[in-house]
Amino acid sequence: MGRRPARCYRYCKNKPYPKSRFCRGVPDAKIRIFDLGRKKAKVDEFPLCGHMVSDEYEQLSSEALEAARICANKYMVKSCGRDGFHMRVRLHPFHVIRINKMLSCAGADRLQTGMRGAFGKPQGTVARVHIGQVIMSIRTKLQNKEHVIEALRRAKFKFPGRQKIHISKKWGFTKFNADEFEDMVAKKRLIPDGCGVKYVPSHGPLDKWRVLHS
């Protein structure tokens, strides 16, 4: 018996059911890589960030996440180059879905119990997504804006329901607005740290502040 179609598991009907010592024998998720492209690019190299945002409360299968990841990555590599972007899948498939297998061969009614003891066996994993939750993000250079929108548009076709494409006002994957970011770095309120930044608050020991601004 093959894999049941993902439309059967589209809606969030049950409570979250993660893999645990009570829920064993769960098959591995299809998606294993969540960060692609130039992951080690410094925070100031990729100021533009585009998000794919869910417009429905639903479940997305790990197979769909993997298909969308491959689709967006292929387009971005072709249009911006292998080192011209950093893509991150923001959902992780932790919710386990079950299947109550039914036999359809001759004499099956003698072998199976129907809906008696119908709690199924683990079949796969899905990610539960809320309205307004980010599914995928891509950071890149400002001139690649149209390519980001097109890559996310193509990836949208791999998912059920509605999604929106949103170009963020923030700088890259940080939580700081792009128009304030460079001023804050110049004033040493932000210290670049990999693909993120460290925020330096205006309170604390004076000695630390003096060392930073010396």
From Swiss-Prot:
BP terms from Gene Ontology: cell differentiation; male meiosis I; ribosomal large subunit assembly; spermatogenesis; translation
Per UniProt, subcellular location reads as: Cytoplasm
Q: Which InterPro entries match?
A: Ribosomal_uL16, Ribosomal_uL16_CS_euk_arc, Ribosomal_uL16_dom, Ribosomal_uL16_euk_arch, Ribosomal_uL16_sf
**SUPFAM superfamilies associated with the record:** Ribosomal protein L16p/L10e
Q: Which GO terms describe its cellular component?
A: cytosolic large ribosomal subunit; endoplasmic reticulum; nucleus; ribosome
Does the record carry Endoplasmic reticulum as a key word?
no
Extract the GO molecular function terms from the UniProt entry.
structural constituent of ribosome
* Complex formation: Component of the 60S large ribosomal subunit (LSU).
- PANTHER family assigned to the protein according to its UniProt record, in alphabetical order: 60S RIBOSOMAL PROTEIN L10
Q: Please give the name of this protein.
A: Large ribosomal subunit protein uL16-like
Traced from the root, the source organism's taxonomic lineage reads: Eukaryota, Metazoa, Chordata, Craniata, Vertebrata
